[in-house]
């Protein structure tokens, strides 16, 4: 679970880091990053949901010992996921302006969100491939690579956010554009790391990764039958957040800034639960593949208890040290104090 935790942390570090740095730029940048980032994540969750179906199939083949069947799932899933990414990028490059204009009323927030989003969506080309590599390594239970990848992506993102947003280390001062571009480059570095590691360290022949073959639509449909509901679930969970932020945007920049800060804390708190959920998917699939169906319920009970206890500890820290945690995102005293009550509400919800 720990390497998976770090892998999910790295992906969320991109959004959290953007929020933390832009919080020191101003409320408009913070609000625009919230709207643009959520819109990006809404689309990204479709690919993430698809990768969950691939991960379940890969884990099943791994549990059965049918290692040669893993490669076709990986490569066919990657081809379809990348195709989705290219198609969605093309559509959003054309439709981004009228779509964002429809969703946002403030001209100031609109222009900043549009600037952020049209740079950020280039990350689809890399993020949609990265989710498949994560599915592969979680499915075959070689999760240590996720730790290394997480460190690479987080370091690249933090450094470039600092350099590009504020114009440090010889970079031009790009503000909100810098945050978006830094995130894209971090995702590209993650994909490059996965490719180099896979070809350098993994037995390609054993896992059937040494050949792609022709595009197999039947294989893609099998993955989609498993993942379609997960794709919808993840999309709706993010879409609800986006609708909430749309409502707050109509109340004003201050309310939007507070919501983005508190949501960022919520995302970090949710990572242990997500990592345990991902672990459960893989372990259950491996158990079923190896014939250990009887142990599934006991395993799930153990993971659920662990998840709740971890969340109790995280919530307790937030309740005891709210201002210390929120100060990561802003040095404005009034904004910090106004964010504390919302943080308490989120903490209560996390235990549910």
Task: Pin down the residues of each PLM region.
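Short runs within selected transmembrane alpha-helices of multi-pass transporters and secretion channels
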Residues: 51, 55, 120-139, 146-157, ...
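Transmembrane helical elements of multi-pass membrane transporters/channels
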Residues: 3-15, 119, 153, 186-190, ...
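Small-residue hotspots at the loop-to-helix junctions and early N-terminal turns
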Residues: 27-38, 113, 117, 180, ...
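Helix-terminus/linker motif at the lipid-water interface of multi-pass membrane proteins
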Residues: 9, 13-31, 100-107, 163-174, ...
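Generic alpha-helical transmembrane segments of integral inner-membrane proteins
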Residues: 5, 9, 13, 17, ...
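Small-residue-rich hydrophobic transmembrane alpha-helices
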Residues: 19, 30-90, 127-146, 240, ...
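Short alpha-helical transmembrane segments in multi-pass integral membrane proteins
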Residues: 1, 58-125, 171-228, 284-349
């Amino acid at each position: 679970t720990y390497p998976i935790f770090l892998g999910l942390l790295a992906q969320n570090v991109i959004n959290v880091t953007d929020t933390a740095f832009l919080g020191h730029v101003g409320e408009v940048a913070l609000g625009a990053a919230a709207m643009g980032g959520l819109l990006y994540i809404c689309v990204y969750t479709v690919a993430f949901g698809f990768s969950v179906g691939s991960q379940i199939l890969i884990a099943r083949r791994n549990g059965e010992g049918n290692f040669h069947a893993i490669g076709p799932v990986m490569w066919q899933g990657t081809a379809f996921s990348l195709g989705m990414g290219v198609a969605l990028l093309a559509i959003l490059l054309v439709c981004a302006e009228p779509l964002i204009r429809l969703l946002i009323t403030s001209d100031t927030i609109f222009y900043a969100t549009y600037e952020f989003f049209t740079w950020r969506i280039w990350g689809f080309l890399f993020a949609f491939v990265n989710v498949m590599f994560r599915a592969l390594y979680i499915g075959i239970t070689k999760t240590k690579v996720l730790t290394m990848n997480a460190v690479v992506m987080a370091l690249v993102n933090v450094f470039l956010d600092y350099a590009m947003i504020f114009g440090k280390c010889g970079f031009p001062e790009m503000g909100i554009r810098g945050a978006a571009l830094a995130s894209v480059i971090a995702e590209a570095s993650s994909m490059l790391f996965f490719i180099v590691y896979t070809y350098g360290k993994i037995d390609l022949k054993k896992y059937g990764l040494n050949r792609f073959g022709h595009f197999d639509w039947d294989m893609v449909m099998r993955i989609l039958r498993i993942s379609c509901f997960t794709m919808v679930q993840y999309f709706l969970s993010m879409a609800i957040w986006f609708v909430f932020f749309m409502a707050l945007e109509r109340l004003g920049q201050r309310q939007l800034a507070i919501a983005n800060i508190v949501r960022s804390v919520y995302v970090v708190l949710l990572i242990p639960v997500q990592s345990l959920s991902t672990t459960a998917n893989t372990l259950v699939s491996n158990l079923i593949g190896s014939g250990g169906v009887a142990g599934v319920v006991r395993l799930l009970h153990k993971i659920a208890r662990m998840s709740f206890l971890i969340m109790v500890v995280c919530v307790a820290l937030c309740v005891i040290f709210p201002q210390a945690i929120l100060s990561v995102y802003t040095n404005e005293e009034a904004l910090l104090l106004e964010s504390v009550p919302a943080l308490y509400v989120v903490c209560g919800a996390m235990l549910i």
